[in-house]
C-alpha cells in the first residue's frame, strides 16, 4: 500500500500548524523503524510529496521525499498533489488538501473560520470555509483537541465520534538551549517582567494584556512582547502612551526560552484556540502561566495554569499582582507543569495516527 503525506507545509511560513506537521512526520518516520509498528505499515511505501518551492527540509529515514508538480499554493494542493497522490492514502496535516481525493485524512486544527469570522478577511473566509465543507464531504477529518473535535463536528455537520484527535506537543522546545544574553539586552530583571509571545492576529488578544498593564501601572515590571513586526503590533493604537511595554520583536527560540525561564509569568490571553502550545513551552522552562479560559486552552493546561476571562483586563491584572506577591514558582506548581507537558508527545500522537491508518493497511496487505 502507498501512503502519501501532503508536504505543502514545507513551503509555508513556519507557524504552529507547520510545526505540528513537521514534528508528526518526523515521529512517524521514527515509528516506521520500530518493530512495535504493524508490518503492514512498516512495509508500505511512504512518500512525503512537496512543491518545488519547498524551502524547509526534513531529515527522514523511512519516508521518501519527492518534489512534484510546478504549481504553488492551493493550486498545487488541488492539481499537482491530487494527481501525484492518486492510488494511495493521502495524509494532510496542515488544514488543507485536495478536496476530491478519494482516500484522504486531513487534520483541521480549529473551527475559527466558522466560529470567529471577525478574525479574517472575506477572501480567506470564502476559501477556507468552502474547503472545510468540501473536505468534510469527501475526506476523513481529524483534529488536535477534544474542543476542536466538538466544534468541527457542529460546524461541518459531522459525528464527533468520527473525528480522531491527534494532539499537539511542545517536546520540540525542550531541545532548545536558552540564550540568557537576551535578559541584559532587553534591560529587564529576572522575575520582574511578564511575557507575551505571539502574533498580532485578533485571536491572540494582545489588547487585553496591554489594558491589564495599564491597570497594573508598574513601569518597573514591564510586559515583554515577542513576535511580529513592532510597527504593526499596535496598528489599532492600543499601545499608544502605555508605559510598561517592551517590544522585543522577533527573537530566536533560544532567546524566547531564556525569557520563559526568567519571567514572572507568561500571559496567554487568547480568545480562541484549537489547542494552545505556547503555555506548554513556557511550562517546560518553569514559567508560571496566566491563561484565558478559552476552552481549548483549559483543556491543554488543566490545573497547571491560573485563569482569567479573556475579556476582563481587571481579572488579568489581579492575577499578575498575585503572581508578583507569590514570587518564584513552587515545587507543587512545577510538578503540575511537568505532568502536563509530559501528557502530550509527538510520538504518542503519531502512534495514534498510525493506529488509525492500520486497519486499511492491513486490508490492503491481505488482498
Predicted feature descriptions by range:
Residues 1-367:
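Carbohydrate transferase catalytic cores enriched for Leloir-type hexosyltransferases
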Amino acid at each position: 500500500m502507498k501512503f502519501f503525506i501532503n508536504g505543502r507545509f514545507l513551503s509555508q511560513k513556519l507557524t504552529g500548524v507547520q510545526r505540528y506537521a513537521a514534528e508528526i512526520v518526523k515521529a512517524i518516520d521514527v515509528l516506521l523503524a520500530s518493530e512495535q509498528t504493524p508490518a503492514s505499515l512498516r512495509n508500505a511505501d511512504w512518500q512525503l510529496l512537496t512543491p518545488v518551492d519547498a524551502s524547509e527540509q526534513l531529515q527522514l529515514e523511512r519516508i521518501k521525499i519527492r518534489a512534484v508538480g510546478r504549481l504553488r499554493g492551493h493550486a498545487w494542493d488541488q492539481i499537482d498533489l491530487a494527481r501525484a497522490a492518486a492510488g494511495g492514502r493521502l495524509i494532510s496535516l496542515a488544514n488543507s488538501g485536495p478536496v476530491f481525493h478519494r482516500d484522504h485524512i486531513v487534520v483541521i486544527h480549529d473551527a475559527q473560520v466558522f466560529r470567529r469570522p471577525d478574525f479574517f478577511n472575506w477572501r480567506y473566509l470564502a476559501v477556507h470555509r468552502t474547503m472545510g465543507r468540501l473536505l468534510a464531504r469527501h475526506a476523513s477529518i481529524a483534529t488536535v483537541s477534544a474542543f476542536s473535535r466538538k466544534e468541527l463536528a457542529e460546524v461541518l455537520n459531522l459525528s464527533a465520534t468520527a473525528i480522531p484527535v491527534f494532539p499537539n506537543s511542545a517536546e520540540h522546545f525542550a531541545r532548545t538551549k536558552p540564550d540568557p544574553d537576551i535578559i541584559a539586552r532587553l534591560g529587564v530583571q529576572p522575575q520582574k517582567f511578564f511575557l507575551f509571545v505571539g502574533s498580532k492576529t485578533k485571536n491572540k488578544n494582545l489588547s487585553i494584556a496591554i489594558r491589564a498593564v495599564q491597570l497594573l501601572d508598574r513601569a518597573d515590571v514591564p510586559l515583554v512582547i515577542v513576535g511580529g513586526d513592532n510597527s504593526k503590533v499596535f496598528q489599532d493604537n492600543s499601545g499608544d502612551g502605555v508605559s510598561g511595554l517592551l517590544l522585543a520583536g522577533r527573537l530566536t527560540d533560544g532567546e524566547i526560552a531564556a525569557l520563559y525561564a526568567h519571567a514572572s509569568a507568561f500571559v496567554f490571553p487568547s480568545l480562541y484556540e484549537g489547542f494552545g502550545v505556547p503555555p506548554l513551552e513556557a511550562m517546560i522552562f518553569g514559567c508560571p502561566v496566566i491563561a484565558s479560559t478559552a476552552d481549548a486552552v483549559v483543556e491543554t493546561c488543566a490545573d497547571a495554569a491560573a485563569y482569567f476571562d479573556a475579556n476582563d483586563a481587571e481579572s488579568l491584572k489581579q492575577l499578575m499582582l498575585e503572581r508578583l506577591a507569590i514570587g518564584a514558582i513552587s515545587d507543587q506548581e512545577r510538578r503540575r507543569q511537568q505532568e502536563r507537558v509530559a501528557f502530550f508527545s509527538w510520538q504518542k500522537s503519531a502512534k495514534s495516527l498510525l493506529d488509525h491508518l492500520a486497519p486499511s493497511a492491513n486490508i490492503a496487505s491481505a488482498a
